Amino acid sequence: MAKLTKRARLIREKVEVTKNYDINEAVALLKELATAKFVESVDVAVNLGVDPRKSDQNVRGATVLPHGTGREVRVAVFTQGANAEAATAAGAELVGMDELAAQVKAGEMNFDVVIASPDAMRVVGQLGQILGPRGLMPNPKTGTVTPNVAEAVKNAKAGQVRYRNDKNGIIHTTIGKVDFETAQLKENLEALLAALKKAKPAAAKGVFLKKVSISTTMGAGVAVDQSTLEDVK
């Protein structure tokens, strides 16, 4: 049997896999176990009470976390005219139409989020095979296809996270960095779960937020007792 690393041994000793932890205790555990030489992200996995095989039960959207994600986000915007000026003023790194599409086709994709005004979708639509597999294709449900591109840029810069359940009905996203204050991570998690509750499909029955686990980039998941969170019980 392969030898456990020092970190893996520590996780095995400290984390009770069957326990739901108070949110403050869960965050304290993550901080204690975050021994990587870089500032790890704090990620969340939310098991939803949906049948992902049914299109009317899939959950997709976006929300701005009150304390952001701790990441510097580079934004590309497909738009023109006054919208292009507004996007640039809002902080977008790349703004354009056909010339920006040419950069993408050439493999120059130095950005984390793509936003498009509706009139630009004729251009963006040609890039689906490039942007789609990378999770970068703009979509109205996540607020990345919008006539108000400036607001979308500001949201992306402010720490907006996008979410979409996978084939197992689980949402995976980030809620900050391990060096955030415990209260900041708690409030970010609460904001995400509140957004998910609002996005609950009408066809979904029974318990919607079935399980919530948080982890660091290199760490194991710690299940959170939802009763220790505000307004998401």
Curated annotation (Swiss-Prot):
UniProt record, GO biological process: regulation of translation; translation
Protein name: Large ribosomal subunit protein uL1
Role this protein plays: Binds directly to 23S rRNA. The L1 stalk is quite mobile in the ribosome, and is involved in E site tRNA release.
Assembly description: Part of the 50S ribosomal subunit.
Family affiliation: Belongs to the universal ribosomal protein uL1 family.
Stored Pfam families: Ribosomal_L1
InterPro entries: Ribosom_uL1_bac-type, Ribosomal_uL1, Ribosomal_uL1-like, Ribosomal_uL1/biogenesis, Ribosomal_uL1_3-a/b-sand, Ribosomal_uL1_CS
Molecular function per GO: rRNA binding; structural constituent of ribosome; tRNA binding
Any Gene Ontology CC annotation: cytosolic large ribosomal subunit
Matches recorded under NCBIfam families: rplA_bact
Position of the signal peptide: none
Keyword list, A-Z: Repressor, Ribonucleoprotein, Ribosomal protein, RNA-binding, rRNA-binding, Translation regulation, tRNA-binding
PANTHER family: 54S RIBOSOMAL PROTEIN L1, MITOCHONDRIAL, LARGE RIBOSOMAL SUBUNIT PROTEIN UL1M
